[in-house]
Amino acid sequence: MITKTNRNLERKRRHLRVRKKIHGTPERPRLNVYRSLKHIYAQIIDDVSGRTLVAASTLDPELRGKIGYGGNIEAAKAVGRLIAERAKAKGIEKVVFDRGGYLYHGRVKALAEAAREGGLQF
């Protein structure tokens, strides 16, 4: 009998495998992405101190009124621009990109490219 694979469980395994190699430092923190069906979230994390330095999502009041639906590529681009803007304000220019076990495609790719256009280097 063929068992159906749980895609979220596979994603979590990929994420743990990647997290063994990638970690954020105070000089170069980690840009983490989480994607749900309706929203997308991004955080810049210093793993040494275990603190979130900057966060942005489609649930932010700044973006909530501008974008209608948070689960599309346009919303991901808006979150990427917002996270880059907030990071620059805190003096963060270089980050390590953590795609969270998701494929580098679609909304994750759009967020990353918008963050790069906003001035983040990774």
Swiss-Prot record:
GO terms for molecular function: 5S rRNA binding; structural constituent of ribosome. It holds the Pfam family Ribosomal_L18p. GO terms for cellular component: cytosolic large ribosomal subunit. The gene is rplR. NCBIfam families: L18_bact. SUPFAM superfamilies: Translational machinery components (SSF53137). This is Large ribosomal subunit protein uL18. This is one of the proteins that bind and probably mediate the attachment of the 5S RNA into the large ribosomal subunit, where it forms part of the central protuberance. It comes from Carboxydothermus hydrogenoformans (strain ATCC BAA-161 / DSM 6008 / Z-2901). Belongs to the universal ribosomal protein uL18 family. Gene3D superfamilies: 3.30.420.100. Keywords: Ribonucleoprotein, Ribosomal protein, RNA-binding, rRNA-binding. CDD domains: Ribosomal_L18_L5e.
